[in-house]
Amino acid sequence: MPTEHTYKQFDAELEAVRANVLKMGGLVEEQITNAVDALISGNMELADQVDANDHNVNALEVSIDEDCTHIIARRQPTASDLRMVMMVVKTITDLERIGDEAAKIARMAKLIHQGERISLPRFSEVSYMASLVLDMLRKALDGFARLDATKAVEIARQDQSVDEEFRLNLRHLITYMMEDPRTISVFIDILFVTKAIERMGDHAKNMSEYVVYMVKGKDVRHTSLEEIEKEVM
């Protein structure tokens, strides 16, 4: 029968894993900021830094995943403890994918700034989209840290705003390309950037939904905003 000491060890292991998830989240936040800054400023050293740090994001995912595997094997968690471990495993997958999208933006920044220099009026909209997604990610990480399921509602609303911004940017970019065919190549690159940011928002939304699963025991993936509100409010 498990002793109090065993339970304390288990709790300590879970807290250590959660702390590493937040560490990974902080690194991914920095990756997004640096990637977008590299795109806007043309700072290729910053773009290179994002590319190099992607390895650190990946390494953290592998390390945390291994820790979770060991916890399941040794402790055989049940009920809410098992949901906690599963929340961590799913969360780090989405964080790693957000990191991949940030690295993609850094690569696109190199392509854009190493090509022909032309007017790039859509950077302000890219910056705005990125700010929305960064706020979503911070809220998702805060919800993870506090086990606050209500963050999922805020984030789902913001995800709708990000999706609308993407559609608006798409229309603008198509208009610019039609008006000046010389811009087609660079604006297609910017379109890939905005799509990467939109995907980041999707991953942040996923993360908030895992917290709902942890706290409420309800899977709200692929449900409407109204259904999420019903579960958590």
Where are these regions (language model features)?
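Cytosolic, long alpha-helical scaffolding segments
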Residues: 1-233
